[in-house]
Structures are given as structure tokens and as C-alpha cells.
Regions:
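An internal, amphipathic alpha-helical element
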Residues: 45-47, 53-55
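Short linear segments in flexible contexts
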Residues: 25-29, 53, 135-138
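Short helix/loop capping segments that flank catalytic or ligand/cofactor-binding pockets
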Residues: 1, 48-50, 81-82
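C-terminal functional extensions of proteins
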Residues: 35, 45, 59-139
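Active-site rim loops that border cofactor/substrate pockets in soluble metabolic enzymes
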Residues: 1-37, 41, 46
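Gly/Ser/Thr-rich active-site loops/lids in small-molecule metabolic enzymes
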Residues: 11-25, 56-75
Length: 139
């Protein structure tokens, strides 16, 4: 409601959230990338959008590979409909994620994310990588 009020009070100069543009930009990143993987905290709409970049790219006539891997941290369980019955295994059936490299982490993110990030940092694999600036692809 806050953004609606903001737009009403500032009809000529206001903030707009454009989810279609954002999805198109995510799809452009997927199309231009050599490969991709997903690291998702939680689920819902953002998870669905990022997974669907593969399908959107194909609908635009572009050949793209599935996301090479996916990790999702969530307390949601498909048994009660909390994750819309949309597990990573389901994502592989649509050609979104390579099923051989997917892992659901059923945990509360604030308890396990620091452990995962700390492990990744201390392994040091990032030290020899070139820094990315994805904003350049929108030129």
C-alpha cells in the first residue's frame, strides 16, 4: 500500500516496481551467461522467476542450458503445500534445473546460511575469479 500512496502523492515523479522488466533482465542474464546455478533462500515468487528464466529464454527462441545446480534453504515442505509443491526435483521435470546437482536444505536460513557462506569464503575459490559487473549487459 505504501507504493500506491507514494504514487498517488507524486503522480509525475514516483518509484515503480516493474516485475516484468526485472524478469526480462534476469532472462537476459541467463541468455548471456556461460552457465548458471541457483542459491535460493526461501521460496515463493522470486524462486519461480529465477528458475523460469530457462523457459522464458527458450520461448524467446534462445538455446540455453538448464541451471547447472540449485541449492534451496527453506523451512517449507511440499507435504503441506507450503512451497507450492514445487521442490527442486519438480523444477528438473520442467528442464529448469539439472536434477543431479540439486539440494534442498530444510532449515531456518538464519541458522545455516552463515555456516554455508563461511565455508565458501574459507575455501577461497573466489580469489582467482574475475569480478563480474552484470549491470554492463544492459548498456
Amino acid at each position: 500500500f505504501g507504493l500506491v500512496m507514494h504514487q498517488e502523492q507524486n503522480p509525475k515523479n514516483h518509484i515503480t516496481i516493474d516485475s516484468i522488466r526485472e524478469f526480462r533482465e534476469l532472462t537476459e542474464i541467463k541468455i548471456k551467461s556461460k552457465g548458471s546455478g541457483l542459491f535460493m533462500i526461501g521460496g515463493g515468487v522470486p524462486k519461480n522467476f529465477i528458475q523460469d528464466t530457462v523457459i522464458c529464454a527458450e520461448l524467446l527462441g534462445k538455446e540455453v542450458e538448464m541451471h547447472k545446480y540449485a541449492v534451496q534453504i527453506s523451512v517449507a515442505d511440499s507435504r503441506d503445500g507450503a512451497c507450492s509443491s514445487s521442490t527442486l526435483k519438480e523444477a528438473s521435470s520442467w528442464g529448469k534445473v539439472n536434477v543431479t546437482k540439486e539440494q534442498m536444505v530444510f532449515a531456518e536460513a538464519t541458522s545455516v546460511l552463515p555456516l554455508i557462506v563461511s565455508d565458501a569464503y574459507h575455501r577461497g575459490e573466489w580469489k582467482n575469479r574475475n569480478r563480474k559487473n552484470f549491470s554492463k549487459i544492459f548498456g
